[in-house]
Amino acid sequence: MPHLPLASFRPPFWGLRHSRGLPRFHSVSTQSEPHGSPISRRNREAKQKRLREKQATLETDIAGESKSPAESIKAWSPKEVVLYEIPTKPGEKKDVSGPLPPAYSPRYVEAAWYPWWVREGFFKPEYQARLPQATGETFSMCIPPPNVTGSLHIGHALTVAIQDALVRWHRMRGDQVLWVPGSDHAGIATQAVVEKQLWKEQGVRRHELSREAFLREVWQWKEAKGGEICEQLRALGASLDWDRECFTMDVGSSVAVTEAFVRLYKAGLLYRNRRLGRWMSCPLTQLSRRFQVENRPLPGRTQLRLPGCPTPVSFGLLFSVAFPVDGEPDAEVVVGTTRPETLPGDVAVAVHPDDSRYTHLHGRQLRHPLMGQPLPLITDYAVQPHVGTGAVKVTPAHSPADAEMGARHGLSPLNVIAEDGTMTSLCGDWLQGLHRFVAREKIVSVLSERGLFRGLQNHPMVLPICSRSGDVIEYLLKSQWFVRCQEMGARAAQAVESGALELSPSFHQKNWQHWFSHIGDWCVSRQLWWGHQIPAYLVVEDHAQGEEDCWVVGRSEAEAREVAAELTGRPGAELALERDPDVLDTWFSSALFPFSALGWPQETPDLARFYPLSLLETGSDLLLFWVGRMVMLGTQLTGRLPFSKVLLHPMVRDRQGRKMSKSLGNVLDPRHIISGAEMQVLQEKLRSGNLDPAELAIVAAAQKKDFPHGIPECGTDALRFTLCSHGVQGGDLCLSVSEVQSCRHFCNKIWNALRFILNALGEKFVPQPAKELSPSCHMDAWILSRLALTARECERGFLTRELSLVTHALHHFWLHNLCDVYLEAVKPVLRHSPCPPGPPQVLFSCADIGLRLLAPLMPFLAEELWQRLPPRPGCPPAPSISVAPYPSPCSLEHWRQPELERRFSRVQEVVQVLRALRATYQLTKARPRVLLQSSEPGDQGLFEAFLEPLGTLSHCGAVGLLPPGAAAPSGWAQAPLSDTVQVYMELQGLVDPQIQLPLLAARRSKLQKQLDGLMARTPSEGEAGTQRQQRLSSLQLELSKLDKAASHLRQLMDEPPAPGSPEL
């Protein structure tokens, strides 16, 4: 289902006034007609002047050039900010005894509620177990722990909005809900940020500090940033159980991580091996995720500035190097390479065995062009003879393909690039210690001096860049720890295939199955200081060269010493142990989160009660690297799937469809949308970050373009509602601030509706129980039926977890049913004295039930308004709407009247026709009389029952019925509703044809110009044919209406004034 079009909140109807009872045939509405009489001379002259000015404006617009898009952009006007200024201590209930402010103000509404919710314990499952509507069922979720590397972005806000809506709905239903908060230590990201900050503020590098001193700096930074993230979660209204908050580096998590490592090792699923891996420098460390790698396509020669390198480096080039044939001075094999800096690590040259150019050299030796040592020329079917010269250098220590080839031929790798990105001692003194790209230039220079450089040429290529450091990715050989994933992966794939694990949307199943069918072992070692240090110890002892190191694993050094004593047969006290300095991949601890957050490995009450989790909701980009690993480790370590259902939401993009990125300057901070931010504030935040000056200038310019007037204050509820209005079934979510701003207008509409309702109820109003309320008229019955339908649609949306169904139903009820129809319909009834008892009771039920339906999505606004409603007698009210019962469709089913709704939609069609006629003849203030004529008896009876609402809704005067077959009145505009229904509107005395005809001609000319331009223009590539045709049809229809209106006006000029008007 398409998401709710929040960008356009124009109501289809102005409103509907109430019709008391069923009028007799030919009966009319009794409202006054102040504008139905002929226009006075003074008013006529003023109106003619305004119309002449308007006509001149129209003609100027038609003749002049259209404005550029930039000129049409208007700055948002800041709304009046109302503050809650009643002294209230944090945790005390907000004072709602005073009147509502005249307009919705997010800061006023959102003040004081959250601390009170937390202090009262509404978010704790222990409280929910005591609710009257308690079901005895449990519902548990954990928040995807955000990285402590900074503030939450709009993607986090989407996660919170969806999860909190589901959590609040389950809580109001009566389930015992546990939603666990937490944050992730984010090893690589956090260490990089802190290192950058240390250098920026203190001029200190990490290695100039001890490991302990550096970790103290990280912990201090975490405490500052972690608190900021918690405050953002509170501002978003996340109903988390803060007493159960956890952090992936706290004591409980550390115990769980160590236990998991030990158990996996004992199960034979953890091992240590020397393998090639992708590394980044500054400092060089093992990369853990594919999205830390940006594959940048290069069309040819491209210069890049890299961290730590003094000059720009050229890429997209193929260097040709000659390898002399040993024993033949004039013979050589030319090899093409994009990485001449790895030449010192070459151990062979390979050719295809069937390449006739090199058949005579099979088995021969070549001379290394730099080092001079002999290299074998080997044959391998992996070589592509038609690429380059058909000969390739083999560097097993720095290329995955070369590593496989070297293994096939028994070639030993040579590590020539160190972990800090410099050249190793194996390269010789002349290269050792040089930055690898500085060494490149020196190597090419030496090759040229020796006459072995054969030139370079442009070479399109894809260059892997680290998205964090901006450096080129290197492949290095190192001994590290690996998790065997084949067996666990097969179980994860089988869980989805069997239906034990449900992925939604279901199209993600294909990626899941493909990934697990091709899964390799998982490298969990990271060369960092920040993180869980690996609980593995090297037994330091003398052993013969070539023997493998002896490693032991233990929950503590004492336990590891006992294991080492058993392995070596020596007393543990005599053994020297060195703990592995590396830390575990951040994903390792994150993969344990669903059960470590509940106390595992201890058998805690929370673990027994809330594990497995009821649902995992997260971004689709985390499906494999987080969700997949949670399933693998959860099943292995606990014997059960960590959850049975996974709900995946799309990635948030900007309104242009671009990924939100700091480098693009289009990242939206939820706080800026909630509270608003001027352009100066947005720019100052950029300057306070860690961007380098060149990048800062680009980002600042992009930000000014996207938000030229800053960001308006929209509030938390508007942001949450907007995010939830986008369905999860489609592609990426493209979000614009204007969409959220439109939803703020929707909040204001609800606010004004409750102000009206509270005023209408008065202080002495006593609500009836909902089950005793029965409608006393058609309009009451209609709105209660729509309310019951809304409750049913909301339940369907929550059960299917398609929140766009919920937002659509609520938006339609509050705006189009309640505000635009029923509230207008009930106004004349409420003015009667004495006021009938039915409408106030209906108003109360709409407010009470409507707010409870809304509460999971707009918790602050719903609480603020619901607290001001009078309680129903006979049952103690819930202290908060957050723990009040969610409306059940079953309990409201007796209000459903689908046939009445269908019939009333016919009335709304008449209103649309009347409103179109008013717009065509520009009857802005006049209240023309209306006649309806139908040849169908059913329509006649329907219209007779709704004469007053028809007049009110269409802003017309008296509405009457014209008998079937009767002649059309003279001087009245006519419009068909259908083949059987005609609508007539009085024009005589209300419209001056001499003024209106030129205006219609100007409007027609403008529309004709648009139509001609559209027909002459060649459709752009990708433009939908149906959209173009719809636009053409719309313009042609409008032109037809104008022509018909002009014909009516000319006829009105030719006809003498009617001696009398039809009797209504």
Curated annotation (Swiss-Prot):
A GO BP entry: valyl-tRNA aminoacylation
Top-level enzyme category: ligase
Catalyzed reaction equations: tRNA(Val) + L-valine + ATP = L-valyl-tRNA(Val) + AMP + diphosphate
Ligase is among the record's keywords: yes
EC number(s) on file: 6.1.1.9
Motif segment ('HIGH' region): 146-156
ATP-binding found in the keyword field: yes
Transit peptide location on this chain: 1-26
Residue window of motif 'KMSKS' region: 659-663
Gene Ontology CC annotations of this record: cytosol; mitochondrion
Keywords attached to this entry: Aminoacyl-tRNA synthetase, ATP-binding, Ligase, Mitochondrion, Nucleotide-binding, Protein biosynthesis, Transit peptide
Record Pfam families: Anticodon_1, tRNA-synt_1
Binding site residues for ATP: K662
Disordered as annotated region, ranges: 25-65
Location (main, coarse): mitochondrion
Localization per record: Mitochondrion
MF term (GO), any: ATP binding
Compositionally skewed regions (Basic and acidic residues) per UniProt: 42-56
Family (UniProt): Belongs to the class-I aminoacyl-tRNA synthetase family.
Protein task: Catalyzes the attachment of valine to tRNA(Val) in a two-step reaction: valine is first activated by ATP to form Val-AMP and then transferred to the acceptor end of tRNA(Val).
PANTHER family recorded: VALINE--TRNA LIGASE, MITOCHONDRIAL, VALYL-TRNA SYNTHETASES
The protein, known as: Valine--tRNA ligase, mitochondrial
Organism the protein comes from: Macaca mulatta
